[in-house]
Amino acid sequence: VVASRGLGDVYKRQLRRLFWGDYMTPADEDDRPYVEVRDLQLLQNRTEDSLAEFNQTSKKPMELVMFMFAIEHVSRIARVLRMPGGNALLVGVGGSGRQSLSILATEMAGYALFRIEITKSYGMAEWRDDLKKVLIEAGSGDRPLVFLFSDTQIAKEGFVEDINNMLNAGEVPNIFASDEKVAICEKVGPFAKEQF
């Protein structure tokens, strides 16, 4: 309504500078309040510190400049990831930083990151094995997990079908054999008892 009165540009700029999230508190702390971030310099410092932490432990460090547009996107991605069942489809031109900013948001959230490595011989069998790993880790791991999958990794149409099933139904039909299901139940049993 306000934008239609000719004040749209002012309010759009102000809305872009509204930052809310729990990412200002370090990920290892139990109490992470969801608050408005009013100090943009503090937010920039937090993203740069998270980037430095990631680069210290990563085999593939990232060289990113944390300008305001990038910080806005990291904030959005971090908020989405922290939602229960949070997932995001990031659309844009190649090289625009979607993966790098997602990795940084994952670091800020304190989540584990899982990415597949595509090789020439990578097919449905390897894909299913990787999916099993990520599903078991997500269900039995001690911290939440982000599965980062890029459009450049779609070697087979079945990859997209499996991701669609995970997002819509919460499972990939017939991915686990009966004996694997028994082993999984034994592995996640203690974790499930803690949660409930």
What are these regions (language model features)?
Residues 14, 31-120, 128-131:
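Terminal-proximal interaction/regulatory segments of ATP-powered molecular machines
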Residues 81-83, 106-108, 136-142, 155-157:
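Conserved catalytic network of the ASCE P-loop NTPase/AAA+ motor domain
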Residues 95-96, 120-122, 152-156, 173, ...:
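Conserved nucleotide-binding/hydrolysis micro-motifs of P-loop NTPases
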Residues 126-148:
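Conserved alpha-helical scaffold flanking the Walker A/P-loop in AAA+ ATPase domains
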Residues 150-151, 162:
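Walker B catalytic acidic pair
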